[in-house]
């Protein structure tokens, strides 16, 4: 079994899972459907969390008992949690800049690669954590170790397999610049991020949480991963990466401020800490990502494209459905700020006018008019 969810507290554990899953979906909808909701979620709340965490840090440095006994200091003091929450927030803010075309940066075509960059950074943070556990096994000879937060982790080849899977997963992201705003500005769309990537990512990331956050994986592994995936498959096609960033940031802030939910309440759920299970899950993650990258190479060769500069999933059902959600060019032109240059507008129009089915290998080339 993966988790200890069959004892006397099982009803609370399943209830807790349902609350997290539904809560994340609802919070994501609030954040994506309005600018105010997004600014509150990723502006006001992060500021409040930062002030709270800084106050605790100052208190700890001064030896204050209230700070030393604060749950955030006890359970969420590692480098990973702080790196993850702020990296996720950076992604959310960048995505809002793209979908709302905020400033010159938000309108720049080169900035559309920001989703790739920030997702890669988030993956590398997790890979670093997996390799940290592997170090305890290979360098220190430990098959288990206890983190600074009091969490027991397994250490071994499972971390190596999943760390490699994470690195491969970075290169499973295709069409880095093919990012658009949706018709209603609710979403930033990445049409080339189809089910192939989503499934490979979800398996890898679940395995990461199972390896390195075994006492949290019931929530941050299953509920947190399924919330954006369900939204993408049922009502927000093409918006998975935004769903993922939004729900991740919201969950990380909640976990940072209210860690007792996962640590000392009736909702606490631990993994079984079974080495065989952890290894099997890690091998599955590696196999899934190898399969994904092989399929991407196959499609790239079939279409004759560079899968990173151009789209690899042109002509697929998921790709077309996402492309059909793009904002109309006429609307984009109406809302272009006065500061937009003719070159910026021409590039935006060229990409936005591509057919929903896609154009294999398309790359915009600016045409300079002869001056007479």
Which residues fall in each region the model found?
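Hydrophobic cores of alpha-helical transmembrane segments in multi-pass inner/ER membrane proteins
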Residues: 16-24, 82-99, 161-176, 224-229, ...
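C-terminal transmembrane-bundle signature of multipass membrane proteins
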Residues: 21-25, 220-351, 361-363
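An N-terminal, globular interaction/scaffold subdomain
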Residues: 2-102
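Generic multipass alpha-helical transmembrane bundles of integral membrane proteins
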Residues: 105-238
């Amino acid at each position: 079994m993966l988790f200890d969810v069959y004892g006397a507290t099982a009803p609370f554990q399943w209830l807790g899972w349902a609350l997290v899953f539904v809560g994340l979906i609802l919070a994501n909808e609030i954040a994506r459907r309005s600018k105010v909701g997004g600014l509150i979620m990723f502006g006001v709340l992060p500021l409040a969390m930062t002030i709270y965490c800084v106050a605790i840090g100052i208190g700890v440095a001064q030896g204050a008992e209230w700070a030393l006994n604060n749950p955030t200091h006890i359970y969420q003091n590692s480098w990973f949690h702080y790196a993850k929450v702020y990296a996720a927030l950076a992604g959310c803010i960048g995505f809002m800049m793209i979908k709302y075309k905020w400033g010159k940066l938000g309108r720049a075509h080169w900035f559309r690669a920001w989703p790739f960059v920030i997702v890669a950074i988030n993956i590398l943070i997790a890979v670093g954590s997996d390799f940290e556990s592997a170090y305890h096994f290979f360098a220190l000879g430990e098959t288990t170790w206890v983190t600074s937060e009091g969490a027991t982790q397994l250490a071994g080849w499972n971390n190596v397999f999943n760390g490699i899977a994470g690195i491969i997963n970075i290169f499973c992201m295709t069409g880095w610049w093919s990012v658009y705003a949706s018709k209603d500005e609710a979403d930033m769309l990445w049409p080339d991020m189809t089910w192939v990537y989503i499934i490979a990512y979800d398996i890898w990331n679940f395995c990461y949480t199972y390896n390195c956050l075994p006492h949290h994986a019931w929530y941050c592994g299953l509920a947190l991963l399924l919330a954006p995936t369900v939204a993408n498959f049922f009502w927000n096609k093409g918006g998975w990466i935004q769903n993922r960033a939004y729900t991740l940031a919201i969950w990380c802030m909640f976990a940072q401020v209210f860690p007792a939910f996962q640590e000392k309440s009736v909702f606490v759920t631990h993994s079984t800490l079974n080495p065989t299970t952890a290894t099997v899950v890690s091998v599955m993650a590696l196999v899934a990502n190898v399969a994904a990258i092989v399929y991407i190479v196959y499609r790239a060769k079939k279409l004759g494209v560079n899968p990173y500069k151009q789209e690899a999933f042109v002509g697929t059902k998921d790709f077309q459905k996402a492309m059909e959600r793009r904002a109309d060019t006429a609307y984009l032109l109406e809302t272009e700020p006065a500061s937009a240059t003719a070159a910026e507008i021409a590039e935006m129009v060229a990409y936005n006018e591509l057919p929903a089915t896609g154009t294999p290998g398309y790359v915009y080339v600016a045409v300079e008019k002869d001056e007479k």
